[in-house]
Amino acid sequence: MKIQLFFFILLFWVTILPAKMKYPEYGSLDLRRECRMGNGRCKNQCHENEIRIAYCIRPGTHCCLQQ
């Protein structure tokens, strides 16, 4: 079991960490912040006078923009 943990940590250290340093723009995208920067609000349901453009954090919440 310890050897498996060692190989898992080694695999993580060799593959994921260098990729995160090389491509930080793909690491984590805060969709909630992006929605707020576009004058939107994260809601479960958009009203009739709002446009749904994307998901916020979960697939159940939408970024709603005023028309």
UniProtKB/Swiss-Prot annotation:
GO biological process, one term: innate immune response
MF terms (GO), sorted A to Z: CCR6 chemokine receptor binding; chemoattractant activity
GO cellular component: extracellular space
Key word Disulfide bond present: yes
Disulphide bridges: C35-C63, C42-C56, C46-C64
Compartments in which it is found: Secreted
Keywords: Antibiotic, Antimicrobial, Defensin, Disulfide bond, Secreted, Signal
Signal sequence segment: 1-19
InterPro entries: Beta_defensin_dom
Homology family: Belongs to the beta-defensin family.
Primary role: Has antibacterial activity.
The protein's name: Beta-defensin 110
Species this chain originates from: Pan troglodytes
